[in-house]
From Swiss-Prot:
This protein's record includes keyword Mitochondrion: yes
GO biological process, one term: mitochondrial respiratory chain complex assembly
Complexes and interactors: Monomer.
Limits of the CHCH domain: 13-55
Protein name listed in UniProt: Coiled-coil-helix-coiled-coil-helix domain-containing protein 7
Family under the similarity heading: Belongs to the CHCHD7 family.
Signal peptide: none
Keyword annotations: Disulfide bond, Mitochondrion
Motif placement: Cx9C motif 2: 37-47
Species of origin: Bos taurus (Bovine)
């Protein structure tokens, strides 16, 4: 597996791994009909938007690393009480 692919499959690097997998699985199950999977695409897009805003805020506050680890993301989502996307 190429290095870039391995990085994207790493839960510490990609916060929207489950949403990405769900949209890919939906496309495969629905014979690549994009309209059938639009809800999955929207959830993935909102996930990326949410974690990007978290990353920008952490950069502005000087927090390293800018992207929270998988454990930190679980704490953030737990503190919110529900999925923000």
């Amino acid at each position: 597996m190429p290095m870039v692919t391995r990085r994207l499959r790493d839960p510490d690097v990609n916060p929207c791994l489950s949403e990405s997998d769900a949209s890919t699985r939906c496309m495969a199950e629905n014979n690549y009909d994009k309209e059938s999977c639009s809800s999955h695409f929207l959830k993935y897009k909102n996930c990326r938007k949410f974690w990007n805003s978290v990353m920008i805020q952490r950069r502005q506050n000087g927090v390293k690393p800018p992207m929270p680890t998988a454990a930190e993301r679980d704490e953030i989502l737990g503190g919110l009480g529900k999925m923000p996307y």
